[in-house]
């Protein structure tokens, strides 16, 4: 099977959906003339023209409001944020209009829109460009929240998101745009609201999403050298959460470790831990454990960045703790 970069998978998803449906269009900062800040939309202006690939001012609240209004009037916008850190300026439109309009209108007015862009840390970018936002948006009823970890899932889920009739928050990662993975040439869609088992195992379940899947899979490889077989699950869709797949894995392994790039309080791991202990308490042979980013803004110095984020060695250590192995 061919291998393409993450950015190419996203581009193909948008191109295919824009060819299929003339109501789909892309707008955001530098998406047209500059081919996108991360070159995700490269060549799309030439193919679709300036009415469907639209450069915007640096005014997130304003252009998000235009897109939300377009969605409420029958179009299907894709809004690219250069980073989700900047999208907080548009939160009024995402929270108070896009997520609520279907309920406020008694089901008469929908908002089929995709908000997408880079999320979380990407090295030494400082505190204001390094926040992971999955849990914040997942706390909003009316939104669907997707956070992808590889090109195959990115393409299949973005196509599904563009076709979805609800507003979808679609989170990527700046550090993954150049990474390559297998993506078939034929069309496919992936289901929103499903976890994906990326590695089967019997001893412990490790759950993660977005670029922390690298940590989860890397930890599983290290553990395998010691005879510990970890089952690794990519959540992929944060809301609606497919806790059932996680529960079925825990029924087999009896242990759960969650890895996420977010602050610990009121996080995605908090929700997963609550749901699994509620529905599967009798299957647990150890407390559910998690590894998150530090409960502080992310600093700039490389040693502090390394200390802030989850890593493979800390994850391996945590797995051994839930297996009651010697430290």
Can you say where each PLM-predicted feature lies in the sequence?
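Thiamine diphosphate
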Residues: 1-167, 171, 306-307, ...
């Amino acid at each position: 099977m061919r291998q393409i970069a993450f950015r190419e998978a996203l581009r193909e998803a948008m191109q295919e959906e824009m060819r299929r449906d003339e109501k789909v269009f892309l707008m955001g900062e530098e998406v047209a003339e500059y081919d996108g800040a991360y070159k995700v939309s490269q060549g799309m202006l030439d193919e679709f023209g300036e009415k469907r690939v639209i450069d915007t001012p640096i005014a997130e609240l304003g252009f998000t409001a235009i897109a939300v209004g377009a969605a409420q009037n029958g179009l299907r916008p894709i809004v690219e944020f250069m980073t989700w850190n900047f999208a907080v300026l548009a939160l009024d439109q995402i929270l108070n209009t896009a997520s609520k309009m279907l309920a406020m209108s008694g089901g008469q007015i929908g908002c089929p829109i995709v908000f997408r862009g880079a999320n979380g840390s990407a090295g030494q970018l400082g505190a204001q460009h390094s926040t992971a936002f999955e849990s914040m948006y997942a706390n909003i009823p009316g939104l669907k929240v997707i956070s992808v970890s590889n090109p195959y899932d990115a393409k299949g889920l973005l196509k599904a998101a563009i076709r979805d009739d609800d507003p979808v928050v679609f989170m990527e990662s700046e550090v993954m745009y150049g990474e390559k993975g297998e993506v078939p040439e034929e069309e496919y869609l992936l289901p929103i609201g499903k976890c994906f088992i990326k590695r089967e195992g019997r001893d412990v379940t490790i759950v993660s999403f977005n670029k922390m899947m690298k940590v989860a899979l890397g930890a599983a490889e290290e553990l395998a050298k010691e005879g510990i077989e970890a089952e690794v699950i990519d959540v992929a869709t944060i809301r609606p959460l497919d806790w059932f797949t996680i529960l079925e894995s825990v029924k087999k392994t009896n242990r759960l470790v969650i890895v996420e790039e977010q602050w610990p309080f009121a996080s995605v791991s908090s929700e997963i831990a609550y749901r699994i202990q509620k529905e599967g308490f009798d299957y647990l042979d150890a407390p559910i454990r998690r590894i998150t980013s530090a409960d502080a803004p992310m600093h700039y110095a490389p040693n502090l960045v390394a200390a802030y984020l989850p890593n493979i060695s800390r994850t391996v250590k945590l797995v051994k703790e839930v297996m009651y192995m010697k430290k």
